[in-house]
């Protein structure tokens, strides 16, 4: 209960009460959740598409483009995105932070989804196509439910990374 770390006076929860009455801390927590949820949702959609494209089409440059944010150090990516936003006259704020987090998280989602697709039995999708399903219907009714654990895992990973990653911000 002491204001000094070096002096132990006793156990108290009073500081947590003060934390929840601090407007700046509540606003920071709200912004963090907003950024995390938005970035992970958008990164999950685009990361799933990227993972599917990397699995389905063997384009040499695609994995390099999608997975580059994973290999680049966070500080370098943060500075690069800052320069990018300034050059394009994009105002620095919540939108630019969300875009940065999306760019950072897409690669992680793509890796998880691609690995889930690699473990999937392709004959199930082929059977759906043989039975008259369109490519979209086969994807929606067969492939997507089978890769859903990977999509959810990618979304959770993206949310965790977004909440954790202060350097990109």
Where are these regions (language model features)?
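Loop-to-helix entry region at the N-terminal start of transmembrane alpha-helices
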Residues: 27-35, 84-108, 148-150, 155
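Short membrane-interfacial helix/loop motifs at transmembrane-helix boundaries
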Residues: 1-23
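Glycine-rich helix-loop "coupling/hinge" segments at transmembrane-helix boundaries
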Residues: 3-9, 160, 166-169
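Hydrophobic alpha-helical transmembrane segments of multipass integral membrane proteins
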Residues: 26, 30, 34-46, 50, ...
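Transmembrane alpha-helices
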Residues: 102, 110-114, 121, 135-164
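Transmembrane-helix boundary motif in ABC transporter permease subunits
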Residues: 35-66, 83, 122
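Short hydrophobic faces within alpha-helices
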Residues: 29, 54, 68, 123-131
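Membrane-interfacial helix termini and adjacent extracytoplasmic/periplasmic loops
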Residues: 6, 13, 75-105, 136, ...
């Amino acid at each position: 209960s002491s204001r000094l770390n070096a002096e132990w006076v006793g156990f108290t929860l009073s500081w947590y009460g003060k934390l929840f009455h601090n407007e700046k801390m509540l606003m920071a927590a709200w912004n963090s959740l907003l950024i995390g949820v938005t970035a992970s949702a958008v990164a999950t959609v685009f990361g799933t598409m990227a993972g599917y494209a990397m699995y389905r089409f063997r384009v040499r440059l695609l994995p390099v483009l999608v997975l580059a944010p994973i290999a680049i150090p966070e500080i370098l990516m943060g500075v690069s995105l800052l320069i990018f936003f300034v050059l394009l006259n994009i105002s620095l704020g919540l939108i630019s932070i969300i875009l940065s987090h999306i760019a950072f998280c897409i690669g992680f989602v793509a890796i998880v989804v691609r690995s889930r697709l690699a473990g999937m039995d392709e004959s199930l999708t082929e059977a759906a196509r043989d039975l008259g399903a369109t490519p979209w219907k086969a994807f929606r009714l067969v492939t997507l439910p089978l890769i859903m654990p990977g999509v959810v895992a990618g979304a959770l990973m993206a949310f965790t990374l977004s909440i954790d990653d202060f350097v990109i911000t």
